Amino acid sequence: MAHNKRLKAARASVDSTKFYPLTEAVALAKTNARAKFDETIEISLNLGIDPRHADQMVRGLVSLPNGTGKTLRVGVFARGPKAEEAKAAGADVVGAEDLAELVQNGTIEFDRCIATPDMMALVGRLGKILGPRGLMPNPKLGTVTMDVKGAVTAAKSGQIEFRAEKAGIIHAGIGKASFDADKLVENIRALVDAIQKAKPTGAKGTYLQKAALSSSMGPGMRLDVSSLTV
């Protein structure tokens, strides 16, 4: 009952006809994060693309300046010195054939997967398992690399992956409700900047079409898209 009252009050505070400036929306999302846990602040962006065309896919990595507030588990496929480098950098699980066997058996204890180039013949066999989960290492995303230390450090320090879904929408968690409002704004603008830079050459018309912001359990607010960039 208390939860329903909180949700009702949160919904009542949002004007569904308004396009909120980013700073106002962030402040309201923080206020409406009334759950007993530290809610994630989430943004969705509708892009003017057609992801059915290979040349209009939007995908990339961005390091949020203030992190996400979430501990990311990192798995690394590597051998020898590179495996040791991964462990020293803080990777949660490191291995080769042994790690591949765990994945094949359904034990996936990581949220980001990194591999050295020489491991891709092995990792490629796991594509049907890792691919649908968005975990397949990709050289374009910097997750197939010899710089294992750099990739692990980036993942652990607030780097997130963004990817447009079939309808051309990107969803991302950009921090916790406990973050200062200005830190959330900085994170959102870093994400939007990265998405702008990833604009496909084949995309026509308005690229950033719509945007909405909410906390995990709170109501969504439509955003004034022009306020998303500095």
UniProtKB/Swiss-Prot annotation:
Cited SUPFAM superfamilies: Ribosomal protein L1
Database matches in CDD domains: Ribosomal_L1
BP term (GO), one: translation
Family annotation (InterPro entries): Ribosom_uL1_bac-type, Ribosomal_uL1, Ribosomal_uL1-like, Ribosomal_uL1/biogenesis, Ribosomal_uL1_3-a/b-sand, Ribosomal_uL1_CS
MF-aspect GO terms: rRNA binding; structural constituent of ribosome; tRNA binding
Cellular component GO terms held in the UniProt record: cytosolic large ribosomal subunit
Highest taxon of the lineage: Bacteria
Keywords: Repressor, Ribonucleoprotein, Ribosomal protein, RNA-binding, rRNA-binding, Translation regulation, tRNA-binding
Keyword Disulfide bond on entry: no
Pfam family, one: Ribosomal_L1
PROSITE patterns on file: RIBOSOMAL_L1
Subunit organization: Part of the 50S ribosomal subunit.
Functional description taken from the UniProt entry: Binds directly to 23S rRNA. The L1 stalk is quite mobile in the ribosome, and is involved in E site tRNA release. Protein L1 is also a translational repressor protein, it controls the translation of the L11 operon by binding to its mRNA.
Family membership noted in the UniProt record: Belongs to the universal ribosomal protein uL1 family.
Protein name: Large ribosomal subunit protein uL1
